[in-house]
From Swiss-Prot:
It catalyses: L-methionyl-[protein] + [thioredoxin]-disulfide + H2O = L-methionyl-(S)-S-oxide-[protein] + [thioredoxin]-dithiol; [thioredoxin]-disulfide + L-methionine + H2O = L-methionine (S)-S-oxide + [thioredoxin]-dithiol. Its EC number is 1.8.4.11. Keywords: Oxidoreductase. The keyword Nucleotide-binding does not apply. The gene is msrA2. Disulfide bonds: none annotated. This is Peptide methionine sulfoxide reductase MsrA 2. Belongs to the MsrA Met sulfoxide reductase family. Has an important function as a repair enzyme for proteins that have been inactivated by oxidation. Catalyzes the reversible oxidation-reduction of methionine sulfoxide in proteins to methionine. It comes from the Bacteria. GO terms for molecular function: L-methionine:thioredoxin-disulfide S-oxidoreductase activity; peptide-methionine (S)-S-oxide reductase activity. The keyword Ribosomal protein does not apply.
Length: 195
């Protein structure tokens, strides 16, 4: 169920707290060609930070990951998501951020992703790897809206920003330590550093 596929590209969308850290982690995963911060899961036909931040639109801060399934599998992306990108036991908050816009949600692109994600959650629950129940939800059929440019590549462009230093750089360090075969020293960026 988690074999590497033929070359090409697929997408995965994960929400797990502030998108700066989630994006920063997946920008360092080999086989990922793009990781874009944005908003998914709301009822409105558009999303911007100012309205999503109120917690009333139903959107979650999320990251759309484009990856080559011949280099990294959806299952491996799930491992990174559950192990280092966020804490799947925190309901509607991650670290210092609270509200439904910071929820733990997998936005499955198709039935296969939904089945793999549900299987993975079931395995984690059965293994009791976490001290609390996993609260990650799976949603389908949701539109992804890219976030504003000032949110893209935030971790890479602002490595000394206190929020990044305290909350997000440790996630990238954990990726390198726990998944050395998947770790890429050079992140794939959405914007060039000159923008």
């Amino acid at each position: 169920m988690d074999e590497k596929a033929a070359p090409g590209s697929e997408t995965a969308i994960f929400a797990g707290g502030c998108f700066w850290g989630v994006q920063g982690v997946f920008q360092h995963v080999k086989g990922v060609s793009k990781a874009v911060s944005g908003y998914t899961g709301g009822a409105k036909d558009d999303a911007v930070y100012e309205t999503v931040g109120t917690g009333r639109t139903g959107h979650a801060e999320s990251v759309e990951i484009t990856y080559d399934p011949s280099k990294v599998t959806y299952g491996q992306l799930l491992q990174v998501y559950f192990s280092v990108a966020h804490n799947p036991t925190q309901l509607n908050f991650q670290g210092p951020d609270s509200g439904t816009q910071y929820r733990s949600t997998i936005f499955a692109e198709n039935d296969t992703q939904k089945q793999i994600a549900q299987s993975y959650i079931d395995q984690l629950d059965k293994a009791k790897l976490y001290p609390a129940p996993i609260v990650t939800t799976i949603e389908t059929g949701k539109t992804f809206y890219p976030a504003e440019n000032y949110h893209q590549d935030f971790l890479t462009l602002n490595p000394t920003y206190p929020y990044i230093v305290y909350n997000d750089l440790p996630k990238v360090a954990n990726l390198k330590q726990l998944f050395p075969a998947l770790y890429s020293e050079k992140p794939v960026l959405v914007l060039s550093a000159s923008n």
